[in-house]
C-alpha cells in the first residue's frame, strides 16, 4: 500500500534537509515528485466542503505581490547622466569631446612623411615633448624618457605647467634622473592624444568639411603602428634637436619596451639602456588582457555605431571606464589589495548591491570614472595594439623589415603629393582567421610530440626554461645589437602584467648575446606589493637603482 502523498512529500523534504546539512559542500537535486494539475483533478472531499462554505470578506486573501523590492542601479544611472550631459554639451556647441591636452608642452612638427612598419604612412606628424635640465655644449648628456601606455610627456612639473608629473619625484636636482647632470626629454608617443599625432588628430589628406570645428580626424583611418614606429618618430625629434647620441634610453612598462627598441634600431646612438617592468616580447596573458579591454571599448554603442568615428558625437565613456577597470586589475597585486581592502564593504549597514559595494569595487569604479574622458578611446586601441605586436625576436624583426621594404615606394608618392586613393585605402587591413582556434583533446606530452618545431618552441618557453634563464635563441639573435650597451633591467615579483620572468629573460638573452655589462634587479614581495605600478611609486627601490646605474 502506497504512503499518503502528504507523508511522502514530508519525508522527501526531511531527507533533502538532512542531506544538505550533512553534506554542506555538495549540491543535490530535489527528489522527483509527481506533478499534480489542479484543473484536471477532482477536488478531495475536504476541498469540496471548503468550497461550499462562504468566505468572510476580511479573510479573503489579498492579491499576490512580490515582497522583494527591485534593486536600484546608481552606477548605471551615473552613466546615463554622463551621456545626457555630453549630449547637452554637443547641442550647446560648447564642444562635446574632452580636451586631451596635458598642459603646456613643446611641439616638434615633421613635414616629411614617415613610413610605419605595417605599411601605413603619415604624410606629416607632430610630437609633443617636455624637457628638464640643461643640454650641455656637446649635447652628450641627453636622456630620452619613454612613457607608459596612457601617460603624457608631463613626467615632471615645469614653469609652464606646474601640475605634478607622473614621475615627479624621480626627476630633479639630486633625483634619480638628476637635472644637475642630465637633460631629460620626454615625449607623448606617436598614436597618443596628448599633443602628438594620433587617431584624434586632423587627417591632412582627408577632404575637410566646411566647418573648421568639424574637420576630418583620422579616427580608424589612422594606420596600425608599432613600438619601433614610435621610437623612429622620437629619433626624428632628436635629429631636429641636433642630438647625435643619447646618454641613456630610459623607460618603464611600455616605455621599457621602447628603451630596448631604441637601442635595437639605433645601437650607435644609445649609450645606456634602462628597462623597468618591461619586456622584449609581449606574452599571451598581457595580449589577452589588452584584447579584452579593446573588445569592451569597441562594443560600447558610441564606438560600434560610428566604427570609431565618434568625434562629432558622444565619446564611448562607458567602454573606456570598463576598459580602465580591467587594466587596473593588472596594474596592482592581490597581496596589496588583501591588505588594503580585504573583504570590507563600503557601507556594511546597507544591504548588498550589484553596483560597487565592496571597497575594492568602489576603488575600481573610481579608477575607471576619473579616466574615461581623460584619454582618447582610439588612442587606447592603437597604442595597446602596438604593445601586443611587440617582439624583438630575430624572426619577427626580419618580417617587419621585409614589410617595410615592400612598402618603401609609398614614401615617394606621399613626398611628391601624388599618393593614389587606392594606395591610401589599403594602409590598414585587419582580417580574421578562416577557422577560429579550438581546444585540443591531446595532453601536454602529445602536444610536445606533435612536431619537432612545436616541441622546441614549447621547451624554450616552458616554466623550467624560464627558471633556468634559458632565453629563446631567436630573442638572443634579436638583441645582438645591445651586446655592447650597458643595461639595467628591473622587475617586480608581484607584477602580473609584466611578470618577473620577462625581465629575467631580457637579462639572460643580453648576457647570452655577449653583453657583459647587464645589471638585473628583481624586487621581491618583501620590498614591493604594488605590482606593475611599482615603477610609479617606489622611489627608493626603483629610483635608487636607476641613480646608481646612471652614475
Swiss-Prot record:
Region described as Disordered: spans on this chain: 1-69, 434-464
UniProt biased composition (Polar residues): 7-16, 34-50
Important for substrate specificity: region residues: 148-151
Acyltransferase found in the keyword field: yes
Positions of disulphide bridges: none
Catalytic activity, EC: 2.3.1.-
GO CC term, one of those recorded: mitochondrion
SUPFAM superfamilies assigned to the protein according to its UniProt record, in alphabetical order: alpha/beta-Hydrolases
Pfam family, one: Abhydrolase_1
Positions contributing to substrate binding: 324, 533
Domain AB hydrolase-1 positions: 141-406
Keywords linked to the UniProt accession: Acyltransferase, Transferase
A single GO BP: cysteine biosynthetic process from serine
Site residues, Important for acyl-CoA specificity: 290
PANTHER family noted in UniProt: HOMOSERINE O-ACETYLTRANSFERASE (PTHR32268), SERINE O-SUCCINYLTRANSFERASE (PTHR32268:SF16)
Family listed: Belongs to the AB hydrolase superfamily. MetX family.
Xref: NCBIfam families: homoserO_Ac_trn, PRK00175.1
HAMAP family per the UniProt record, alphabetical: MetX_acyltransf
Role summary: Acetyltransferase; part of the gene cluster that mediates the biosynthesis of enfumafungin, a glycosylated fernene-type triterpenoid with potent antifungal activity, mediated by its interaction with beta-1,3-glucan synthase and the fungal cell wall. The pathway begins with the terpene cyclase-glycosyl transferase fusion protein that most likely uses 2,3-oxidosqualene as substrate and catalyzes glycosylation immediately after cyclization.
Protein name: Acetyltransferase efuC
Amino acid at each position: 500500500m502506497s504512503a499518503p502523498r502528504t507523508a511522502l512529500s514530508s519525508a522527501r523534504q526531511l531527507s533533502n534537509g538532512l542531506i544538505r546539512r550533512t553534506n554542506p559542500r555538495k549540491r543535490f537535486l530535489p527528489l522527483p515528485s509527481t506533478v499534480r494539475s489542479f484543473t484536471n483533478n477532482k477536488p478531495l472531499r475536504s476541498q469540496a466542503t471548503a468550497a461550499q462554505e462562504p468566505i468572510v470578506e476580511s479573510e479573503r486573501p489579498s492579491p499576490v505581490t512580490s515582497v522583494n523590492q527591485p534593486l536600484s542601479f546608481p552606477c548605471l544611472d551615473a552613466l546615463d547622466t554622463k551621456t545626457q550631459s555630453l549630449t547637452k554639451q554637443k547641442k550647446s556647441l560648447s564642444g562635446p569631446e574632452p580636451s586631451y591636452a596635458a598642459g603646456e608642452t613643446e611641439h616638434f612638427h615633421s613635414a616629411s612623411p614617415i613610413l610605419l612598419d605595417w605599411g601605413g604612412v603619415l604624410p606629416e606628424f607632430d610630437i609633443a615633448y617636455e624637457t628638464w635640465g640643461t643640454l650641455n655644449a656637446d649635447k652628450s648628456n641627453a636622456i630620452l624618457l619613454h612613457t607608459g601606455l596612457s601617460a603624457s610627456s608631463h613626467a615632471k612639473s615645469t614653469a609652464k605647467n606646474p601640475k605634478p608629473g607622473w614621475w615627479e619625484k624621480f626627476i630633479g636636482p639630486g633625483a634619480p634622473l638628476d637635472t644637475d647632470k642630465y637633460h631629460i626629454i620626454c615625449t607623448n608617443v606617436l598614436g597618443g592624444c596628448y599633443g602628438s599625432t594620433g587617431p584624434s588628430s586632423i587627417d591632412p589628406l582627408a577632404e575637410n568639411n566646411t566647418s573648421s570645428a568639424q574637420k576630418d580626424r583620422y579616427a580608424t583611418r589612422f594606420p596600425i603602428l608599432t613600438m619601433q614606429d614610435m621610437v623612429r618618430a622620437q629619433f626624428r625629434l632628436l635629429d631636429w634637436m641636433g642630438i647625435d647620441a643619447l646618454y641613456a634610453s630610459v623607460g618603464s612598462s611600455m616605455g621599457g619596451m621602447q628603451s630596448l627598441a631604441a637601442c635595437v634600431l639605433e645601437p650607435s646612438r644609445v649609450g645606456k639602456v634602462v628597462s623597468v617592468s618591461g619586456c622584449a616580447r609581449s606574452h599571451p596573458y598581457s595580449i589577452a588582457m589588452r584584447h579584452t579591454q579593446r573588445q569592451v571599448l569597441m562594443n560600447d554603442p558610441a564606438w560600434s555605431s560610428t566604427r570609431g568615428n565618434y568625434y562629432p558625437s558622444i565619446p564611448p565613456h562607458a567602454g573606456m571606464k570598463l576598459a580602465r577597470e580591467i587594466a587596473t586589475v593588472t596594474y596592482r597585486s592581490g597581496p596589496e589589495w588583501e591588505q588594503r581592502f580585504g573583504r570590507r564593504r563600503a557601507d556594511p549597514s546597507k544591504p548588498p548591491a550589484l553596483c560597487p559595494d565592496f571597497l575594492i569595487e568602489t576603488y575600481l569604479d573610481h579608477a575607471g570614472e576619473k579616466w574615461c574622458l581623460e584619454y582618447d578611446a582610439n588612442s587606447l586601441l592603437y597604442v595597446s595594439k602596438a604593445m601586443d605586436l611587440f617582439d624583438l625576436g630575430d624572426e619577427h624583426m626580419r618580417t617587419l623589415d621585409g614589410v617595410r621594404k615592400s612598402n618603401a615606394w609609398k614614401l615617394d608618392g606621399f613626398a611628391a603629393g601624388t599618393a593614389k586613393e587606392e594606395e591610401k585605402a589599403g594602409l590598414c587591413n585587419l582580417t580574421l582567421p578562416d577557422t577560429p582556434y579550438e581546444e585540443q583533446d591531446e595532453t601536454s606530452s602529445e602536444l610536445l610530440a606533435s612536431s619537432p618545431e612545436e616541441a622546441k618552441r614549447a621547451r624554450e618557453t616552458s616554466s623550467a626554461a624560464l627558471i633556468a634563464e634559458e632565453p629563446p635563441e631567436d630573442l638572443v639573435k634579436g638583441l645582438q645589437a645591445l651586446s655592447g650597451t650597458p643595461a639595467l633591467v628591473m622587475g617586480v615579483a608581484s607584477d602580473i602584467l609584466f611578470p618577473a620572468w620577462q625581465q629575467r629573460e631580457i637579462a639572460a638573452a643580453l648576457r647570452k648575446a655577449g653583453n657583459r655589462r647587464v645589471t638585473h634587479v628583481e624586487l621581491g614581495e618583501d620590498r614591493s606589493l604594488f605590482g606593475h605600478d611599482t615603477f610609479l611609486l617606489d622611489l627608493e627601490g626603483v629610483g635608487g637603482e636607476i641613480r646608481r646605474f646612471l652614475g
